[in-house]
From Swiss-Prot:
Function: With S4 and S12 plays an important role in translational accuracy. Located at the back of the 30S subunit body where it stabilizes the conformation of the head with respect to the body.
Notes on the domains: The N-terminal domain interacts with the head of the 30S subunit; the C-terminal domain interacts with the body and contacts protein S4. The interaction surface between S4 and S5 is involved in control of translational fidelity.
S5 DRBM domain span: 19-82
Record field: transmembrane: none
Family the entry assigns: Belongs to the universal ribosomal protein uS5 family.
PANTHER family, per the entry: MITOCHONDRIAL RIBOSOMAL PROTEIN S5 (PTHR48277:SF1)
GO cellular component: small ribosomal subunit
GO molecular function annotations of the record: rRNA binding; structural constituent of ribosome
Protein name from the UniProt record: Small ribosomal subunit protein uS5
GO BP of this protein: translation
Oligomer and partners: Part of the 30S ribosomal subunit. Contacts proteins S4 and S8.
Pfam families in the record: Ribosomal_S5, Ribosomal_S5_C
Top-level taxon of the source organism: Bacteria
């Protein structure tokens, strides 16, 4: 609800201002036409607040700035929440997406994020401070990010596990 006579739109803009945007991968494609080469760009963008909310967006455009802007908008629409236990994840999880497999393991306090560059970026923007990750298989950044998001979505807190077991 709106507080202190602020509109819901202003509240949403304020919440979005807390988000950090990171360009993870840019690809330039060229098409040979009669007049020469025509370039187009694709961009993979991450958006996170460092408090457990993270999103990614993939967009294409003829101009690089347009691809980045569209990717950021797609990332904001694709936000998910990440369950944490303190500074780490609740349990170990392995996920395969296309050719990429990602293994996430909880780590003790003070370990830091031990992961490859693309997986590390996702985990850091999600606000996870202590985790070990291993990327197996494909090194395609898009598939790595999608596999990492699948892994994050499969994470359950202790309370959710207890509810499922009926304890």
């Amino acid at each position: 609800m709106a507080k202190n006579n602020e509109s819901p739109k202003k509240e949403r803009e304020k919440a979005e201002s807390d988000l950090t945007e990171k360009v993870l991968h840019i690809n330039r494609c060229s098409k040979v036409v009669k007049g020469g080469r025509k370039f187009s760009f694709s961009a993979l963008i991450l958006v996170g607040d460092g408090k457990g909310r993270i999103g990614y967006g993939f967009a294409k455009a003829n101009e690089l700035t347009d691809a980045i802007r569209k990717g950021g908008e797609a990332a904001r629409k694709n936000m998910i929440s990440c369950p944490t236990e303190g500074t780490t994840i609740p349990h170990e999880v392995t996920v395969q997406w296309d050719g990429a497999s990602v293994l996430l393991k909880p780590a003790p306090f003070g370990t830091g994020v031990i992961a490859g560059s693309k997986v590390r970026a996702v985990l850091e923007l999600a606000g996870i401070k202590d985790v070990m990750a291993k990327n197996l298989g494909s090194s395609n950044p898009i598939n790595q990010v999608k596999a990492t998001f699948q892994a994050i979505q499969q994470l359950l807190t202790r309370d959710e596990i207890k509810q499922r077991r009926g304890v």
